[in-house]
From Swiss-Prot:
Lineage, opening ranks: Bacteria, Bacillati, Actinomycetota, Actinomycetes, Mycobacteriales
Residue numbers marked as site, Interaction with tRNA: 126, 340
Matching PANTHER family: MITOCHONDRIAL TRNA-SPECIFIC 2-THIOURIDYLASE 1 (PTHR11933:SF5), TRNA 5-METHYLAMINOMETHYL-2-THIOURIDYLATE -METHYLTRANSFERASE (PTHR11933)
Name of the protein described by the UniProt record: tRNA-specific 2-thiouridylase MnmA
Species whose genome carries this gene: Corynebacterium glutamicum (strain ATCC 13032 / DSM 20300 / JCM 1318 / BCRC 11384 / CCUG 27702 / LMG 3730 / NBRC 12168 / NCIMB 10025 / NRRL B-2784 / 534)
EC number: 2.8.1.13
Length: 365
């Protein structure tokens, strides 16, 4: 096959490309340039798409003897990821820009151009697996074998079309073995640290970034009884479950810590309460993505709401036509925010199967 290797400049994508070459595919490496501002992400080594990362990706491709290109997706990245991030916080949501980037840029946009240029698939360094069912139908997306690095959650926002054109060569390997393989191949990125920062906020100050783009939208912090505690500069400064930075002078009557339990962007009201007030038992989600035929109607499954969070079993009611689902949790979750992805899994001894996902729009205690 003719495959496009998405080269982030890290060790995982390097080994993924190497394995694709070893498998006999015709491989071309591509690094995505995502920043319109050369003073931010392009010069930072903390993100996943800096100038240093591009140079690392080129060196790997040179080592493998495959062509290497840099594609400028900065306009689409700004529109689909950065602007969406800002808009979501402005309405009281807590988005995950890395999931959004996977959905809109690293797969949808990359595949769109790749297929137009005659490529059959995109190969990435994500820790997830695709397995073919016995009847030879469409492949299933499963968790990677390394529980500490599994990235099936961040891929749960993809559509079936993207999954059909993906290859995840490192999903059946644990991270230490990937580093050993990279070292044996002579890749300079063998010991390169993983990146976790939001690439377009290289200094890590999310509040300052949002404040610059959203501006002052004053509102009030209140307790569970509606008592006003202090004014704030905007709901974008808060997320569900937040404890630090509330700057409330008067302590709670019972002396317990306060957490953000609700955000009403329309009124600018931020409600705080105890950890107990964070517990929710029902999740409503829309903007559904379907990766498995079992994601329909009434099903028992598991749900994960954070990239590195645990799973909770639930009873799901899924209406494909209405683009909506309700998840009744078998045990409560804490700190679940609107805008997060709820990814559904079907437990399986060979690796949990990703059924699909939805974007959380409402929760109930």
């Amino acid at each position: 096959m003719r495959v496009l290797a998405a080269m982030s400049g890290g060790v995982d994508s390097a080994v993924a490309a190497s394995r694709a070459v070893a498998a006999g595919h015709e491989v071309v490496g591509v690094h995505l340039a995502l920043s319109q501002d050369p003073q931010t992400v392009r010069e930072s080594s903390r993100g996943c798409c800096s100038l240093e990362d591009s140079a690392d990706a080129r060196r790997v491709c040179d080592k493998l003897g495959i062509p290497f290109y840099v594609w400028d997706f900065s306009d689409r990245f700004k529109e689909d990821v950065i602007d969406n991030f800002i808009d979501s916080y402005a309405i009281g949501e807590t988005p995950n820009p890395c999931l959004r980037c996977n959905e809109k840029i690293k797969f949808a946009a990359l595949l769109e151009r790749g297929i137009a240029l005659g490529f059959d698939a995109v190969v990435t360094g994500h820790y997830a697996r695709l397995t073919q069912p016995a009847d030879g139908g469409d492949g299933y997306l499963r968790r990677g074998v390394d529980p500490n690095k599994d990235q099936s959650y961040v891929l749960g926002v993809l559509g079936a079309h993207e999954i059909e054109h993906c290859m995840f060569p490192v999903g059946d390997t644990i991270k230490p073995e990937i580093r050993e393989e990279a070292s044996a191949a002579g890749f300079s990125v063998a010991k390169k640290p993983d990146s976790y920062d939001i690439c377009f906020i290289p200094d890590g100050n999310t509040q300052a970034f949002l404040g610059k783009h959203i501006g002052m939208r004053p509102g009030m912090i209140v307790d569970q009884e509606g008592t006003q505690l202090r004014e704030h500069a905007g709901v974008h400064e808060f997320t569900i479950g937040q404890r630090k930075g509330l700057d409330i002078k008067a302590p709670a009557a019972d002396g317990r810590p306060r957490y953000v339990t609700d955000i009403d962007a329309k009124t600018g009201t931020v409600t705080v309460g105890t950890r107990e007030n964070l517990k929710i038992s029902t999740i409503h989600a829309d903007r559904l993505k379907f990766l498995h035929p079992a994601m329909d109607g009434q099903i028992d499954c598991e749900v994960q709401v954070r990239a590195h969070g645990g799973v909770v079993s639930c009873s799901a009611t899924i209406d494909r036509d209405a683009d909506f689902m309700v998840l009744n949790l078998n045990e409560p979750l804490q700190g679940v925010a609107r805008g997060q992805a709820a990814v559904l899994y079907l437990p399986d001894a060979d690796g949990d199967i990703v059924l699909g996902s939805g974007t959380i729009c409402h929760t109930e205690s």
